[in-house]
C-alpha cells in the first residue's frame, strides 16, 4: 500500500444524478467506492462540497458574499451527514466534524480528536468548509489534509479521469496529462482546484491526484500505488 493516510475531496454533485438534491441511490454508489478504499486499511479523511444544494456564485447573486458562503457551508454539513449515513449502512464507522459548531448533529472540528478517529480506523468527514467565508471547499481540503498529516489529496471527479489541456467533453483534441507541477497548473490556468488551495499544497509539498472516482478500481488503485489519473507535485 503506497499511502497510509489520505484526504479525499468530493463534489456534492456526486450525491445526485439529476444535478440537484441528495439521492439515496447516488449516495450509496459513492459510499460503495469509498468502502472499497477503506477496506484496504488506509486511513481516510473526506471533505465534501455543496454543489448539489447551493451554488453561491449563481444562487447568491445580489446577496452578501459572506452570507452566501455560510449557506454553502451549511449545505456541506447536510451532505456530510448523508454520506455518513450511507457509509454506516455499509458497516463503515464514520464521524462528521464541522467547522461551524452544530453539536446536535456532529462533533465540532478538533484536530487531535480527528487524528484519534483516523488512528481508530474511522472515516472522518469534515463539513462546513474552513468555517470562514471567502474560502472554498478545495481550500478546506488542502487545509485539513495538512492538519491531519495526509500524504496526498485525492481530487475526485466524475467522468473525467485526470487533468486535460482543455475540456475533453467539449474538445476531442484535449490531451490528458500524467503529471504536472503546481506551477504548471497555475500558469496554464488548469481547472483543478482554486489558486488558494493549489498554493497551499505547493508550499507544503503536498501532492494531489486528480482521478475519476466512478472508474472501477481507480480509488483503490491510487492507494495501492498504481498510476491513475494525473499527479500534481
Curated annotation (Swiss-Prot):
One GO biological process term: UDP biosynthetic process
Domain of life: Bacteria
Pathway: Pyrimidine metabolism; CTP biosynthesis via de novo pathway; UDP from UMP (UMPK route): step 1/1
Subcellular location: Cytoplasm
Keyword Cytoplasm annotated: yes
GO terms under cellular component: cytoplasm
Keywords: ATP-binding, Cytoplasm, Kinase, Nucleotide-binding, Pyrimidine biosynthesis, Transferase
Catalytic activity: UMP + ATP = UDP + ADP
Residues noted as binding ATP in the record, renumbered to the chain: 9-12, 51, 55, 158, 164, 167
Disulfide bonds: none
Gene3D superfamilies (alphabetical): Acetylglutamate kinase-like
EC number: 2.7.4.22
Molecular functions per Gene Ontology: ATP binding; UMP kinase activity
Function: Catalyzes the reversible phosphorylation of UMP to UDP.
Family stated for the protein in its record: Belongs to the UMP kinase family.
Protein name from the UniProt record: Uridylate kinase
Phylogenetic lineage: Bacteria, Thermotogati, Deinococcota, Deinococci, Thermales
Gene: pyrH
